[in-house]
Amino acid sequence: METVQLRNPPRRQLKKLDEDSLTKQPEEVFDVLEKLGEGSYGSVYKAIHKETGQIVAIKQVPVESDLQEIIKEISIMQQCDSPHVVKYYGSYFKNTDLWIVMEYCGAGSVSDIIRLRNKTLTEDEIATILQSTLKGLEYLHFMRKIHRDIKAGNILLNTEGHAKLADFGVAGQLTDTMAKRNTVIGTPFWMAPEVIQEIGYNCVADIWSLGITAIEMAEGKPPYADIHPMRAIFMIPTNPPPTFRKPELWSDSFMDFVKQCLVKSPEQRATATQLLQHPFVKSAKGVSILRDLINEAMDVKLKRQEAQQREVDQEEEENSEEDELDSGTMVRAAGDEMGTVRVASSMSDGANTMIEHDDTLPSQLGTMVINTEDEEEEGTMKRRDETMQPARPSFLEYFEQKEKENQINSFGKSVPGPLQNSSDWKVPQDGDYEFLKSWTVEDLQKRLLALDPMMEQEIEEIRQKYQSKRQPILDAIEAKKRRQQNF
């Protein structure tokens, strides 16, 4: 579909919506074509600008969402004018929704492409994407902005292969008097150590996330993706920097690039400008090398949409016959409307990178989670109110909620007597686990699920002990900062 757009370009380029367009109802200015998925705070749709024929993306955000965060996202996009950052065209209020009109990137995110093709990327493809991404980061950092959620799901490609940074739902602005931020924000597996530790961070936090993203593009998932996210949060600051699972598969130049990104000390970590001069990036090929993988991904997507549409048509045909019998008012299901929304669900796997264990890296952690029937309201993790307890990072609340849901789902069923209460089970001494051989697979799986709440309790106790020692130090630092004129 998008290749046709290349052959029939818009009548003129849309740069910004004029005052006349902004005073109209959005339906008078745009035709909404289909739902693309979920971004931070709202649903994202593909639409066409009637006057120019240009395809755009529209994020529809419910007004009851965190308006401060939405306004901040718009503000950051408004200030950006770079070919490597998704453009902002304007916004509307429509009923209870805010419509944010943005640049459309027809090939989707890098993680979409990996998942659709069921293949990771080559070094040449990674180098080309990293070069554009670094140019976008260099621009943002020059503007004193931190993206704070760099990952393959937030790097979008247009149909020509140009990479652009997207989803500023958690981005932050640095001022001269606030050289470092102290909020924990982002997606856990990509977080820099200093972000997790809440010791203050600056623009190079994005560089750590970029290094993790490079591994993600090469291996299909970030380091620690196979373990519980809360364990990863404790491991990232304490363990040595992660590296490739099979280093022998990758060139010295690529491994050195990742090594320079994943330096634990932010003061010694390379900047975007410095990394643009790295041999791995300087030798990157043109965007034309990405066209084959983009076309392949779009072909897969189209075939899935066609297959899904056939299923929808068949369901509607069957349902319409039942509706005619059941009710005189519902003669027939609205075929066109159903088709538009349901087609998008052909990507219902989620827009994250290809992950073998979905329960380890849930789709909610990825920006642009493609529309699924049971995950309609989930997107990138949102930043919580900074006035809340600083000792309780926002991602902990998220994971605790997921644990509660898992426990309700798992333990609502009949469980054998010995497994009813996880706290009743004591860990065997001296590693004597022979008795487990007599258990059924079902009992073993239930026991494994029961271990998670025990682990959470132990982690919480450690966190509280750590916080009791850490908080006085943080208070002293904050007091000194307040006495300083400039940081």
Curated annotation (Swiss-Prot):
Query: Which residue positions does Phosphotyrosine occur at?
Result: 433
User: One of this protein's GO BP terms?
Assistant: protein tetramerization
Q: Which domain of life is it from?
A: Eukaryota
The segment(s) forming the SARAH domain are 433-480
Q: What is its main location?
A: cytoplasm
Residue positions, PTM Phosphothreonine: 3, 183, 340, 367, 387
Function, as annotated, reads: Stress-activated, pro-apoptotic kinase which, following caspase-cleavage, enters the nucleus and induces chromatin condensation followed by internucleosomal DNA fragmentation. Key component of the Hippo signaling pathway which plays a pivotal role in organ size control and tumor suppression by restricting proliferation and promoting apoptosis.
What is the official name of this protein in its record?
Serine/threonine-protein kinase 4
**Which organism was this protein described from?**
Bos taurus
